[in-house]
Amino acid sequence: MQLHKEIIDLRSDTVTKPCSKMLEAMMSAEVGDDVFNEDPTVKELQNKTAELFGMEDALFCTSGTMTNQLAIKAHTQPGEELICDQNSHIYHYESAGIAFNSGVQSKLIQGDRGRITAQQIEQAINPDQDWLAKTSLVCLENTVNKAGGS
């Protein structure tokens, strides 16, 4: 019996390559302008995702980084602060997007291989003082690559 060895590289969406069947599916997909809500494939994906999560609507994003940055922007105001693990992707690998896109500062917590506790979060929340940034968001990642993938 011959074993078939195939390596699937899941390090990042930037290192994956579509196979011929994927390319064929892309080339034959019915498309439209998403800005005008005319792309049936995107609409179907968003509708299925919204239904899956029991939500009114969903938004398709082209990358995890884009999704992270949109979520931060939606949940914060400029001058506020978010809390995240010191090894988090949003802090190390998203080109200072937190500060650039949202005008938000980061408070880093030293977790245990990417895991931070409720007690650590509670201790990191700024008190309600005019001279301190309001803590408005806690960002948790699953998994934290830089922390060993835990």
Model regions and ranges:
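N-terminal amphipathic/basic leader segments beginning at the initiator methionine
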Residues: M1-A25
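Solvent-exposed alpha-helices and their adjacent loops that cap or buttress functional pockets
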Residues: Q2-L3, A50-F53, A74-H75, A99-N101, ...
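Structural motif
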Residues: I8, D57-F60, E80-L82, Q105-K107, ...
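Conserved N-terminal alpha-helix of the aminotransferase class I/II PLP-enzyme fold
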Residues: P18-G64, D85-Y91, G97-A99
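Conserved core of the PLP fold type I
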Residues: E56-T76, I109-G111, N142
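Conserved PLP-anchoring active-site segment centered on the Schiff-base-forming lysine
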Residues: A74-H92
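PLP-dependent aminotransferase-class I/II
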Residues: S102-S150
